[in-house]
Curated annotation (Swiss-Prot):
Intracellular or extracellular location(s): Cell membrane
Annotated TM spans: 6-26, 55-75, 85-105, 134-154, 167-187, 208-228
Lineage: Bacteria, Bacillati, Bacillota, Bacilli, Bacillales
This protein's name: Cytochrome c-type biogenesis protein CcdA
Gene Ontology CC: plasma membrane
Function: Required for cytochrome c synthesis and stage V of sporulation. Might transfer reducing equivalents across the cytoplasmic membrane, promoting efficient disulfide bond isomerization of proteins localized on the outer surface of the membrane or in the spore coat.
Length: 238
């Protein structure tokens, strides 16, 4: 029975990738992997950096789901009790990142990596990706609520808190695999992507617009509303 439950949690994570407010964010995810490494209208991120950022993004949203698995603990209650605040903070940060990509604002802290070093500090890139994954997950939870809710019920029936957290970890790994595969394919296609260098300013601004829109929706709480609506009309039933 335990093995069946674990496999259900894993499959639910994979299926959640197809939900209507996770899958459409893949382009933004790709922009996050390389977006800040555009110098002189050329992509300068290497394969190792892209994969590291992908792992950071995965670690960020995995942390959220593990906290949910520990909902009976202080950390879980703190997150649930202040989820709206987390969404608003996340909305502000994502909006700032988007404005930076659009060229509307120029924040020295975000530009210092490119200006001071030939290659960005990998630790800083990893930390930024963890933060973005953490913030996006706060907005995802309403959309994947049906699937996640079922997993939380199973986790609540677990014998121990650690069993519940383990189940949410397996769910996160199911969701993480498609994201990592996308990053792997993206990193292996860099030589082709670089042929689009002349279009990078437009692509970068377009990605920035999407991030600003997501940030505003998160801050106003409309992301959750739209996500809940899309979840109802989703043909996959997830």
């Amino acid at each position: 029975m335990v093995e069946v439950t674990i496999w259900l949690a894993f499959f639910a994570g994979v299926v959640s990738f197809l939900s209507p407010c996770v899958f459409p964010l893949v382009p933004v995810y790709l922009a996050q992997l390389t977006g800040t490494q555009i110098s002189g209208n050329e992509i300068t991120a290497d394969r190792k950096l892209i994969l590291m950022r992908s792992l950071g993004f995965i670690l960020g949203f995995t942390s959220i789901f593990i906290f949910l698995g520990a909902s009976s603990t202080f950390i879980g209650q703190l997150f649930w009790g202040n989820r709206q605040l987390f969404e608003q903070i996340g909305g502000i940060i994502i909006t700032v990142f988007g404005l930076q990509m659009m060229g509307v604002i120029s924040i020295r802290m975000l530009l210092s990596e490119k200006r001071l070093q030939a290659k960005p500090r990998q630790s800083a890139s990893f930390a930024n990706s963890v933060l973005i994954g953490f913030l996006f997950a706060t907005g995802w939870t309403p959309c994947i609520g049906l699937v996640l809710g079922a997993i939380l019920v199973l986790a609540g029936d677990a014998n121990t808190m650690w069993s519940g957290m383990s189940m949410l970890f397996v769910y996160s790994m199911g969701l993480a695999i498609p994201f990592f595969l996308v990053a792997l394919l993206w990193s292996r296609s860099l030589h082709k992507v670089r042929k689009l260098n002349k279009w990078l300013p437009t692509i970068q601004k377009g990605s920035g617009v999407v991030m600003v829109a997501l940030g505003v929706l998160l801050f106003t709480g409309q992301f959750s509303t739209i996500a809940a609506y899309l979840a109802r009309i989703n043909p996959f039933g997830i």
